[in-house]
Amino acid sequence: MMKMLLGGNETTRKIDSYAINELRIPSIVLMENAAISFTKHIGKNEDNFLIVCGKGNNGGGGYAIARQLFSKDKNVKIFCISDENMSNDCSVNYEICKNSGIEIFYKLEELDKLLLECDVVIEGI
């Protein structure tokens, strides 16, 4: 059985900082690896996803997860909290999602309908 280690926000920040600053792993690579790992644990019966994305690195992770799910032929919709002043990694993943044809919604009035249509909501704020 695989051993899983859990840590809080501060531990995660320290691990990320070490990986980025000492090991020189670009943060976008860490984000992509996290998205790939996350989507490996999605059940086969879940097909309709709503990913709510902010403008920081959590949002970037949400966009990366959206891309991974979309590549597995899942029905993916994104609700974008803001497309202004995004972190660099968030902006990169946002642009890839837009260019890939993933539906992105921006109006709060659309959120109720999106929530009713999905099986799973993923929060990336």
Q: Model regions: which residues?
A:
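Glycine-rich phosphate/dinucleotide-binding loop and adjoining beta-alpha-beta core of small-molecule
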Residues: 2-7, 46-52, 57-125
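Positively charged, low-complexity intrinsically disordered leader regions
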Residues: 1-47
